[in-house]
Every structure is written in C-alpha cells, then in structure tokens.
Amino acid sequence: DEATLLNKFLLKYYEIMPTLITGWNIDFFDIPYLYNRICHVLGESQARTLSPIKDVIWLKHRNRYRISGVSCLDYMALYKNFTYNEESSYSLEAISQKELGKGKMKYEGTLDDLMKNDIQGYIDYNMNDVDLVYEIDQKMKLMDLARGICHKGHVPYEDFLFPTRYLDGAALTYMKRLGIVAPNKPRHDEIKHVDLLGAYVKAPNPGRYKWVYDLDLTSLYPSII
C-alpha cells in the first residue's frame, strides 16, 4: 500500500541523505507532490524528515517548498536559464529529443493503466526519465555550472536564478573578512509590508567610468546596442 511505499522510500532517503536533488520540473511537481502525499499518509512530522533539521517551508513568493539542508536544483530551470534559444516546449520529451536524439518510453493507454497492468513497465518508464535527465547533464554539465557560479558568488545553489543575490554574497564575504557577523536576512513572511517611494533614477552622463558593472546582462544588452 501507499504507506508502506512511502516508508520504504524514506528509509532509502535516510540512507542516502542527499544534500542536492535534481530532476525535471521537481520544484512544481515531484517535490510538492511527494511532500504533500507524505503529509497526508504518514503525517506532517514525518514529511519534515526530508530535511536533516526537520524544517520544510512553503515559499509563497516563489511558489515552491524549501527543504532546509537539501538544495533542490530543478533541471528544467537550469536548462531555461543557461541556454540561449527559446524552445516551443520545455517538456522532458521535447528537450531530450533535441539534446539526446531519444525521448520518453512509449506505452499504450494511460500511466494509471501501465501501473495496474505492467508494474515493471511502469518502473522502467520512471527509470528512463531519470536516465534522460542524467544523460542531458552528462552532455551539458549545467549542474557543475550552477554550483561553480554559486560557489564563486557565495550564495546557496537555489539562488542561481537571481543575479542580485551575488551582491549579498559579496557583502557577506567582505563583512566576514572584517570580522563582522551579519544578521540573518528575514524570511519573506517575516517582512512587514511598507509602502516605499520608487528608487532614485539619476540622469546618465555619457562617458567612460571605472568600477561600474551590471549583473543582469539580459536587460543590459538591449540598452547598450
């Protein structure tokens, strides 16, 4: 039954105790589905053991769960962020066909039919999905790229999507060198709403300047061509 399945999954999870998880669209399917099913079947306290410090938080502003102590790098987000062509579809089938020349395992009927009538075929279908993501990363090395950038920028792996976080990393590193312990940044749900005026925009004076850089080349490029 489902409870037995989830308990066996958790035992294997504790045995591995991953510090980094990846998969295709895991932020919006696999992780929330798994967490919510464990909550429903085994209880929330058991679901929180996905985190080594038993802290799983719903990030409303990012519409995803954060498993404290476990970095979740959604490979679909990595692919979107580090490739330059706009794809008509970002499904695993479409991207694996493009990058590997092969796709998901074919089957007749629905996935529910496959599970009920051919459990080994159902397992093979899911294992094939895992293999596709692994082979895409073996080719493109986007996990290594994201980790390298985040190590350089002194930010958590999940923050590869947010260029301004590298300013936080630089500030924290500088303060550490000065022997200053920076306060923890408040969580989004701890920040009180305050109406603020818009930022000051200074009229640019054309010229050549030192010590100027822009973190966001995506928005910078159209303004300098």
Language-model features, listed with the residues they occupy:
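Anionic group-transfer/hydrolysis microenvironments
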Residues: 27, 76, 218
